[in-house]
Amino acid sequence: MEVERAKGSRFRDPGVRLWHFATEILVRCPRCDGRALVAVHPDHRDGHTYAVGWLTAPHRLTCPGCAHVAEWGPRRWQSGAGDAYFTRGGPLVVPELGGPDDPYFGLPLWLRRPCCGRVLWAYNVPHLELLEAYVAAAQRERPTPAGSQTLLERLPAWMKAAGNRAEVLAAIRELRDGERP
């Protein structure tokens, strides 16, 4: 995803949602503690119109370090199980996005670190780059039409606070630099 930056230190919110970054999630491997990837299963057919279709699709965890592979499949929804996605085969539980663990296997995200007394996290490098561009900007433009559902509009106040900018940017850069080979 290309982050659009206007002249100077102005940032224009591209209007993406968190689920845009949930197709490839970097996690800690449960076997070797190395970097692993959680992604939509390669055998899964394309054709979903809505994000919830991708969120409830089968996912696979793969670790290039130790060759560990694990499969995740959607669970049938039952009362009290959270949000449901209704399909021809019956309702499915929609994985809950957000937080420093992946929504499928519950593994710690690879891109996470303490920051400002909280935990800074990102699903992948493009997610981290979007956060960096937003936090670094002196001026931030909302998308049109403005809504409250974009990833950036829903960031916690501590990440948006000007007083935390230097610490948040340092943490983001540390995470990003740790990703370089």
What are these regions (language model features)?
Residues H68, A136-A137, D177:
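Short, intrinsically disordered, mixed-charge
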Residues M1-T87:
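N-terminal cysteine/histidine-rich coordination modules
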